Design a protein with these regions (language model features):
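Polybasic/polar functional segments that serve as interface/processing modules
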Residues: 1-110
Length: 110
């Protein structure tokens, strides 16, 4: 199976969010070919979550799991640590009061 480049996937993800009028932006740009992606959801009430993609061997599929959920400050501190560990990492921040992120949508989930 052919894999999409990270930069292509992010471009498609941001477009899908724009189509739903969900603001999002890149806060850290990583490796354009194979950089890992963390998506931070900021609900604009002092709370946030971040998601990362992981492989479920039992179900033989990729899925998005929660890396951390808590105050915006806690999530930002976690992301700061992740950025120092992985220089190729991309971080996308989504701002939505309802917490919508579309990561479970067809074409984005796996």
């Amino acid at each position: 199976m052919t894999r999409l480049t990270t930069e292509f996937w992010i471009s498609a993800y941001l477009k899908r969010l724009r189509l739903e009028a969900i603001p999002a932006f890149i806060t850290k740009k990583g490796d354009s070919i194979s950089g890992a992606v963390i998506v931070k959801i900021n609900t604009l009430d002092g709370r946030a979550q971040s998601f990362y993609k992981t492989y479920n061997f039992e179900l033989d599929e990729w899925r998005w799991d929660i890396l951390i959920s808590g105050s915006d400050l806690e999530v930002e501190n976690s992301l700061k640590k992740q950025k120092t560990i992985d220089q190729d990492l991309w971080v996308i921040e989504v701002e939505d009061r309802e917490g919508r992120h579309l990561l479970s949508e067809e074409g984005l989930a796996g």
